[in-house]
Design a protein with these regions (language model features):
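C-terminal helical cap(s) of enzyme catalytic domains, especially alpha/beta-barrels
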Residues: 238, 242-248
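Core catalytic lobe of class I
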Residues: 1-240
């Protein structure tokens, strides 16, 4: 199967990436399912054991490493999950990525602030008995393959001095996207991939999202003169993504 640019494929991402050439994309930005029981359709179980889930992520990121060009970067949006016990997914992924061969380049704290809503999951209310922290942040973990520098023509950089100064800070304050409005259980805001794409790629670069979902990464690529490749196992979400791109 030939994988073409500016296309979203309704297939499993591991199978899709195995059809890609080595060293064929400049940047990967994605947010894998968090394994918290969300309904992604019958094609995917979001409530596996931790071991099964981490094995799935490892297989996915191994293929990401293979298709990423030397000097390319990958940005992974993830959140820690659970209460009993609390599961530090960001820590598991950091260790996993180093073992695969990626170089850690830092992490961005996505401060979701007031947009996360008035959660009442605080454990023991006003008591030291068993209070629970309410996460109002997620992580964007940044890694690179091989060379620290991504080669490109500086004239094809599309980030302003003001934005560069802001985006290189390790805390980003952004609201969340509405699942109801978008039509997907866990969309990230368009601002997230747009910032990453402008910070880490040149105009004309190829960006891969192995968990394309509602197509937000592809829309960001269209807005910013980048090429995209996406995989999405759910046919309804794939059609939603294609419709969003057509409306741009």
């Amino acid at each position: 199967m030939e994988i073409k640019e500016n296309t979203i494929y309704n297939i499993d991402c591991i199978d899709g990436m195995r059809s890609m050439d080595e060293d064929s994309v400049d940047f990967i930005v994605t947010s894998p399912p968090y394994n918290v029981g969300k309904d992604y359709g019958e094609q995917y179980n979001d409530d596996e054991s931790l071991t099964t889930y981490l094995d799935f992520l490892r297989s996915t990121f191994k293929e990401c490493y293979r298709v990423l060009r030397d000097g390319g970067r990958i940005a992974v949006n993830i959140a820690n999950t659970g209460r009993k016990p609390y599961i530090p997914l960001s820590s598991y992924i950091n260790i996993m990525m180093i073992e695969i061969g990626f170089k850690c380049r830092g992490e961005i704290i996505w401060d979701k602030g007031a947009s996360v809503g008035a959660s009442c999951a605080w454990g023991s209310w006003r008591s030291p008995s068993n209070p629970s922290l309410r996460d109002v942040h997620e992580y964007i973990l940044i890694y690179s393959k091989g060379d620290y520098k991504h080669k490109g023509n500086k004239d094809n950089a599309t980030i302003s001095a003001e934005d560069f100064t802001e985006y290189t800070k390790s805390i980003w304050r952004m609201g969340t996207a509405s699942a109801k409005k978008i039509g997907h259980p866990a969309p990230f805001p368009l601002t997230l991939p747009e910032r990453l794409i402008n910070l880490y790629t040149f105009k004309g670069d190829t960006v891969l999202d192995p968990f394309m979902g509602s197509g937000t990464t592809a829309v960001a690529c269209v807005h910013n003169d980048r090429k995209y490749i996406g995989f999405e196992i759910n046919g309804d979400f794939c059609n939603l993504a294609l419709k969003r791109i057509e409306n741009e």
